[in-house]
Design a protein with these regions (language model features):
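Zn2+-dependent metallopeptidase catalytic domains
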Residues: 351, 425-426, 484-491
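Short, charged/polar, low-complexity loop and linker segments
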Residues: 130-135, 326, 386-387, 453-460
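Substrate-recognition/cap regions that form aromatic- and gly/pro-loop-enriched pockets
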Residues: 355-443
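C-terminal amphipathic alpha-helical interaction region
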Residues: 454-482, 486
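Short, hydrophobic/amphipathic alpha-helical patches that form generic packing surfaces
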Residues: 94, 149, 153-160, 335-336, ...
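A glycine-rich, aromatic-flanked flexible loop/lid motif
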Residues: 238, 242, 300, 307-322, ...
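Charged/polar positions within long, soluble alpha-helices
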Residues: 73, 156-159, 163, 351, ...
Length: 491
């Protein structure tokens, strides 16, 4: 089991396009817009009428998880693939749902996104039947998928948040304020719920029939609120822990600085006293004229001035050191708090996994592993912090706007160029520029297309578009940017 999870963890983001999740959105939105156009055609027919529903929705809802499965199965089937076991592939299938059946409003988490494309229908069926995750004709999540997803969420909500703090995307004060505000929102929501329950209770008491069953729903809701208050308590404990760490670490810094300052002053004074003693002994043992005595006084005065300046410089340096040291220790406190949170989140996940294992194994568990644990709110607040402080950061927003132009331009060029490639009349239909674009696409992707057998025209056209998606989604951010600049003469 650890080996399966380790492999799945290393591979789970392999399908992400350049610029991450925003890149996914750009690809899907581009196809939604283009497929609505009547002039987006193939042999004079609108392409939206050639493709079937699943093909269209695959293109309109590009998903990194589905792309990962495609890469690990289809695109390495040339005899040199990585030969993953079905248990690993099934663990990576986070959403065993096709593009015609998913909905973010679904209660069941497995249907929140599409998990595989039309092109992988057969392999997914084979995987699920082999591993036993097809139950009563329906695909369900592999049990280890829940752990993979939880590990991904914990890393995102802790390690990524820690990196963002280290880069200065938010201050400790901003984080604490945000965390407190989110807790207040949760508590206020509970107060509203209690008030609504009391309104209903008053109405029922007014029309009381004398049966306790009349109040069962309200009693049940009160029990849920009491349980949720426990969750809020544990969520608050995270903030208490962070504040305590910062308080202690900063106090230690201040104490250290005071000790250093006092020690320096003592050393300067001792040095000054020793100097005076030495000079006085000279006066007693030697015959000195008036000028010598004046010189000694001048030397003493210089020494006093230097000592005063040294103490002042030391104080100023200490203030700067204190500021830097304080920042370091605040980061250290935040880092320790994140480690503390991480352990609690892992504990919560393991509790839910073991407590719900029977329903997970039977394929009826519908939630993530934070559901109904003491840190259900904590993970949501941490994810919200990432959204607030990282994704809405100006530098990130500029990068995403740039990413939109880059990906859309590449799709415009390569998708339109590929329509008539490898057709009988491709010389007539393709422009010289179209042919050049096709030559840029990696040969291994074109070979994969050429050796595939298709049932009809729709499969051929769909597979060409998927080939371009494979090409673009396989780029790094920098490669996509450089290719865009080269194609558009931006140097």
């Amino acid at each position: 089991m650890p080996s399966i999870l380790a492999c799945a963890g290393l591979l789970h983001d392999i399908g992400n396009p350049p610029f991450g999740h925003f890149g996914e959105t750009v690809i899907g939105d581009w196809f939604k817009k283009e497929l609505e156009k009547d002039n987006f055609t193939f042999n004079k027919k609108p392409i939206k009428k050639i493709l079937n529903e699943q093909m269209r929705k695959d293109l309109e809802n590009f998903e990194g998880n589905a792309q990962a499965l495609r890469i690990l199965t289809k695109l390495h089937s040339n005899g040199n693939d990585i030969n993953l076991s079905y248990s690993i592939l099934n663990t990576l299938l986070k959403y065993p749902t096709d593009s015609t059946s998913f909905s973010r409003k679904e209660k069941n988490i497995k249907k929140h996104k599409l998990g595989y494309y039309y092109s992988e229908n057969d392999i997914v069926k084979d995987i699920c039947q082999t591993t036993g995750t097809e139950i009563k004709g329906e695909y369900v999540r592999h049990p280890l998928t829940f752990l993979l997803e939880a590990a991904d969420d914990i890393a995102y909500a802790t390690a990524d948040l820690e990196d963002a703090f280290k880069k200065g995307l938010f201050t400790i004060e901003q984080f604490i304020d945000y965390y407190q505000d989110e807790i207040s929102k949760i508590e206020n929501k509970k107060i509203d719920c209690i008030e609504q329950i009391f309104v209903r209770l008053k109405e029922k008491i007014k029309n009381n029939t004398g049966y306790i069953n009349d109040y069962k729903s309200e009693i049940s809701e009160f029990e849920k609120i009491i349980e949720d208050n426990r969750k809020i308590f544990f969520t608050k404990e995270i903030l208490v822990d962070l504040k305590e760490r910062i308080k202690n670490d900063v106090k230690n810094v201040e104490d250290d600085q005071k000790k250093k300052r006092y020690k320096k002053r003592y050393e300067d004074m001792k040095q000054f006293i020793d100097y005076c003693k030495n000079e006085i002994s000279k006066i007693k043992t030697e015959e000195n004229n008036k000028e010598d005595k004046i010189k000694i006084l001048d030397d003493l005065n210089t020494k006093i001035e230097n000592n005063a300046k040294n103490v002042e410089d030391d104080f100023n340096i200490s203030q700067e050191e204190k500021r830097m040291k304080t920042n370091e220790d605040i980061f250290s406190a935040f880092q320790k708090c994140i480690d503390f949170i991480k352990k609690w989140l892992m504990y919560a996940v393991l509790y839910r996994f073991y407590d719900s294992f029977d329903s997970i194994r039977e394929g009826v568990y519908k939630y993530d592993l934070f559901y109904d644990t003491f840190h259900e709110h904590t993970i949501k607040i941490l994810k919200g912090a990432m959204k607030k402080f990282v994704f809405n950061n100006n530098d990130i927003l500029k990068l995403e706007l740039s990413a939109k132009k880059i990906i859309e331009a590449l799709l415009n060029d390569f998708i339109y160029a590929v329509r008539y490639w490898n057709e009988d009349n491709d010389n007539e239909k393709m422009s010289k520029s179209d042919k050049k674009y096709i030559n840029i696409i990696s040969q291994s992707l074109k070979d994969e297309y050429i050796k595939t057998e298709f049932k009809d025209e729709s499969e051929k056209l769909y597979s060409k578009f998927m080939m371009v998606i494979d090409f673009i989604s396989g780029m790094t951010d920098s490669y996509a940017k450089n290719l865009y600049q080269e194609l558009y003469g931006i140097y």
